[in-house]
Amino acid sequence: IRDTNTVGLTGVLHADEVQNNEYGNLLKLVYEISKAQDSEGAGGSWGLGKTVYFRVGIGLVLYYSRIKLETGKYESRLVACFVEDETSKDSMIPKYLNRNKRGIAWWGKKTEENKTIPITDESEIKKIIENFTGLPIFEEQETGTMIIIPYIDKDRLLPIINRKNEMSLRLQWNNKIYEYL
């Protein structure tokens, strides 16, 4: 999913940096999952709807964005998130210290034990994005966001579509992921 010429995933890189309750788009979309909304007029409640991307694949989603900073400079950001059923015997995310398992893990630049922030090194981001998508990164004055869902599970996605169409004509685009999406 690619959205160009938008503000992108703005805001601070880590929740520890939040001031005056200004989380920005990055933290709200990527990191604030399973946290109650406390802002007046905020939509949703716990942010669980954001995990819908994880249901069509293996649970891995990459978020890439390029924003224009207040200084006028541009910054690229890349972070990955993995969501799994933490109750499954095959779960991969280990329990951390004495906390309950949440089934959510983030990947990026390690800042300290069990903490990461998005990668901002443009050359590193370019390699990763081109490997996963074959698409170019945002350049020059271009801003926007890409949500990348690698390893879409065709058997999990397409049978649902085909079941809904059993009584009707089976459409060509319901048999190929790239045509369906």
Can you name each region flagged by the protein language model?
Residues 1-72:
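Flexible ATP-lid and adjacent glycine-rich G1/G2 motifs of the Bergerat
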Residues 41, 45-181:
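GHKL-type ATPase core
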